[in-house]
């Protein structure tokens, strides 16, 4: 997570791979020359930058990166790792909470369901009304959900701005939701 404005981000592509790739959309500044018979693209990376760039988002993304570098990525990772370990221990105490994706090196993101008939959207609504924001749905991963035999999960993401107290608040809210729905 890089905390930039919505729609901002970066993609690294090795130079040799970039030369092999063809643009998948068209627009200004990516084309060197165009006629009815052919199109000649600008050199990389410009041939992939169609249309008007998102200038404000790029500036905001740069400021976000400067902020992260000031804090220090190692310190952020250490904090998020502590939150992950804390949340794992808290969630293990909820025997009715089923977490998905428990790879040892995963980030501080938890997808979960409750045993029983509770739907992820119902869980997220109850948790939200208690001041905790989680996502609910298929998270743009419908084939994975189908493979797991699920129609939706709730997802909680912890970052540099979160605390163990907020994990406690989430845990308490999940217990409340389970009392209502479980």
What is the role of each PLM region?
Residues 1-182:
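Pyridoxal 5′-phosphate
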């Amino acid at each position: 997570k890089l905390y930039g404005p919505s729609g901002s981000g970066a993609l690294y592509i090795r130079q040799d791979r970039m030369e092999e790739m063809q643009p998948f959309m068209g627009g200004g500044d990516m084309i060197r020359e165009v006629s009815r018979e052919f199109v000649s693209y600008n050199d990389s990376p410009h041939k992939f930058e169609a249309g008007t760039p998102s200038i404000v988002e790029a500036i905001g993304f740069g400021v976000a990166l400067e902020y992260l570098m000031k804090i220090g990525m190692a310190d952020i990772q250490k904090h998020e790792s502590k939150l992950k370990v804390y949340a794992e221990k808290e969630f293990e105490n909820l025997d009715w909470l089923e977490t998905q994706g428990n790879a040892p090196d995963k980030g501080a993101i938890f997808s979960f369901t409750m045993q029983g008939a509770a739907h992820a959207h119902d869980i997220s609504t109850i948790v939200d009304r208690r001041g905790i924001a989680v996502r609910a749905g298929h998270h743009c991963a419908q084939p994975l959900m189908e493979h797991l035999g699920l129609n939706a999960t709730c997802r909680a993401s912890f970052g540099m701005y979160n605390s163990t107290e907020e994990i406690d608040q989430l845990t308490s809210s999940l217990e409340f939701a389970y009392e209502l729905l479980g």
